[in-house]
């Protein structure tokens, strides 16, 4: 799926995005991510607090509202300038960037910037091969940093292009991608992320962390 296609899709969608997801698609991604991260922090006996948080594919800022109170500094990046404009109007972020995720992460890594939480809510479904992007995120996490994301799934293995032009991923594929990035999988839970034509969409909520944080239990 090309960068141009995704940018144009969401530039056109930006003005009605929040209403479409929350009112018509019953989107649950932000709440599911918040619950999964909170459970991981609770299991580790660590406070639900993050010095620097990165919202990948932040869109209009729907997901970050669930985390703003627990993040000192919040950075968002999205391919669509129109979505970024919507996010900026909410005043939730300390920094917003319009651009490609891979290029943004490469620049952050080169600048030695680090985040103790990175989230991607309903973002990776537009990426065929997750290995490069997950590895890039790992490169900007603190030694005990966390990556949490939602994706659609299917009953088979590997990656499948759906009729919606979104990708779905098998559980074993996700496990392999996490391991290849040098991250430790903390949870991989099935969940209905949203509905499509009133039918629940099968998804997975993933929480992973840096190998350096093996004490996380």
Residue locations for each model-derived region?
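Acceptor-substrate binding/catalytic loop of class I
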Residues: 157-173
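A conserved beta-strand element that flanks and buttresses the S-adenosyl-L-methionine
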Residues: 119
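Class I SAM-dependent methyltransferase SAM/SAH-binding core
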Residues: 52-54, 59-106
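Conserved beta-strand signature within the Rossmann-like core of class I S-adenosyl-L-methionine
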Residues: 144-152
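Core SAM-dependent methyltransferase catalytic element
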Residues: 195-217
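A short glycine-rich, Lys/Arg-flanked "PGG" loop and its adjoining helix->strand segment in the class I
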Residues: 131-143
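Conserved alpha-helix/loop element of class I SAM-dependent methyltransferases that forms part
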Residues: 26-49
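Conserved S-adenosyl-L-methionine
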Residues: 184-194
């Amino acid at each position: 799926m090309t960068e141009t296609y995704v940018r144009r899709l969401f530039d056109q969608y930006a003005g009605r995005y929040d209403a479409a997801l929350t009112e018509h698609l019953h989107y649950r991604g932000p709440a599911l991510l918040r619950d999964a991260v909170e459970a991981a922090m609770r299991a580790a006996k660590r406070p639900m607090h993050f010095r620097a948080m990165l919202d990948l594919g932040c869109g209009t800022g729907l997901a970050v509202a669930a985390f703003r109170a627990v993040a000192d500094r919040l950075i968002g990046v999205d391919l669509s300038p129109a979505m970024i404009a919507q996010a900026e109007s909410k005043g939730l972020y300390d920094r917003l960037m319009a651009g490609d995720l891979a290029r943004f992460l490469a620049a952050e890594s080169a600048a030695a910037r680090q985040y103790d939480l990175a989230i991607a809510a309903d973002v990776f479904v537009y990426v065929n091969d997750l290995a490069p992007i997950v590895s890039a995120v790992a490169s900007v996490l603190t030694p005990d940093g966390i990556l949490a994301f939602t994706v659609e799934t299917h009953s088979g293995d590997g990656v499948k292009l759906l009729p919606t032009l979104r990708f779905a991923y098998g559980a074993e594929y996700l496990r392999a991608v996490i391991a290849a990035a040098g991250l430790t999988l903390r949870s991989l839970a099935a969940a209905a992320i949203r509905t499509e034509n009133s039918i629940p969409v099968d998804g997975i909520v993933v929480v992973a962390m840096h190998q350096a944080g093996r004490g996380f239990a």
